[in-house]
Amino acid sequence: MNEFINFDEISRETWQNLYNTSIAPLTHDELESIRSLNDEISLQDVEDVYLPLIHLLRLYKKNLEDMSYSKGLFLQKIVKTPPLIIGISGSVAVGKSTTARLLQLLLSRAFPKLTVDLVTTDGFLYTTDDLKNMGILDRKGFPESYDMEKLTSFLYHVKNGERFEVPIYSHETYDILPNQSQIIDSPDILIVEGINVLQNPQNQLLYISDFYDFSIYVDADEKLIEKWYLERFDSLLKLAKYDQTNFYHQFTKMPEDKVLNLARETWARVNRVNLREYIEPTRNRAEIILHKAENHHIDKIYLKKF
């Protein structure tokens, strides 16, 4: 069966003409401040792709409010509108983080009186020590390396308007930061970004996908993602060259050809396997798929029909 049978394929040209918005435009500096390493994004991308997406999210927000009001009428009591939770998934190096930060910025502009928070699922990885004790350090990034029960609990508490402390993950130390956390306290909109956002653990009464009001999958050809991964790896090495506390500093002492081989092996052994077996199979669970071509150019949008 065609995986996209339940999606409308929309060209960028058609998509950009679907809605003209009055949201204040971003500056080049604002866009640069949220851009991830080696990700390509332009003000034209914001105008053509993301502003129409913001309008679509407005419709989902309004629908959530209307449903809460109608439920209150039925129950004959006040029903508070729960936060709109948006999930963003996709492979490593595909540009999820940039998309998440951009949406946070644009939604804050679209809803200036509302709180828009952003959380990455990296914070729900087990610590390096825990992974070692569990004997799965070499499986870091795979589903079993995440505390999915804690992630589900977090989403449950947020949906119920309750405060939650989220662990903070550092890409510099490649581990959870001890005694540090991000406080999430009753946001109006929450964006959750990570490779496992659409994955559902087995034997759970509640699935992660149950909590999302809207979900996005950032997609690209596997060969392109590999290219972007290798480019990002190289950029991380350059940043770590003079920082001995950085996880990637250890690789700066190696010959360039050996480092490149290591990066390729890591992609083939970990990231490609993870993409094929666990990440890409969740693609059709998303409400919308943003498809990227060369230079991170979004050329097609797939919107779920029902």
Curated annotation (Swiss-Prot):
Binding-site positions, ATP: 90-97
Record EC number: 2.7.1.33
UniProt-annotated location(s): Cytoplasm
Pfam families documented for this protein: PRK
Keyword Transmembrane helix: no
Main location: cytoplasm
GO biological process, one term: coenzyme A biosynthetic process
Pathway involvement of the protein, from the record: Cofactor biosynthesis; coenzyme A biosynthesis; CoA from (R)-pantothenate: step 1/5
Enzyme category, top tier: transferase
GO molecular function per UniProt: ATP binding; pantothenate kinase activity
UniProt xrefs under Gene3D superfamilies: P-loop containing nucleotide triphosphate hydrolases
GO cellular component, as recorded: cytoplasm
Reactions catalysed according to its record: (R)-pantothenate + ATP = (R)-4'-phosphopantothenate + ADP + H(+)
SUPFAM superfamilies according to UniProt: P-loop containing nucleoside triphosphate hydrolases
Keyword Ligase annotated: no
Keywords: ATP-binding, Coenzyme A biosynthesis, Cytoplasm, Kinase, Nucleotide-binding, Transferase
Domain of life: Bacteria
Sequence similarity: Belongs to the prokaryotic pantothenate kinase family.
Designated name of the protein: Pantothenate kinase
